[in-house]
Amino acid sequence: MKDFKIYLSTAPVVAFAWLTFTAGFIIEINRFFPDPLVFSF
């Protein structure tokens, strides 16, 4: 279990989790408040 925690704290895993969270957050913001520059018909 100790090795698994060390693996989860490595830079690529942390970066992947952070970018996934950021992308999901941006997608949800754009779903509720669409960008006015994009015309959705």
Swiss-Prot record:
InterPro entries reported in the protein's UniProt record: PSI_PsaJ, PSI_PsaJ_sf
Localisation: Plastid, Chloroplast thylakoid membrane
Listed Pfam families: PSI_PsaJ (PF01701)
Membrane topology: Single-pass membrane protein
Transmembrane segments: 7-27
Biological-process GO terms, alphabetical: photosynthesis
Major location (coarse): plastid
GO cellular component: chloroplast thylakoid membrane; photosystem I
Domain of life: Eukaryota
Entry keyword set: Chloroplast, Membrane, Photosynthesis, Photosystem I, Plastid, Thylakoid, Transmembrane, Transmembrane helix
Function: May help in the organization of the PsaE and PsaF subunits.
Family: Belongs to the PsaJ family.
Descriptive protein name: Photosystem I reaction center subunit IX
Native species: Stigeoclonium helveticum
Gene coding for it: psaJ
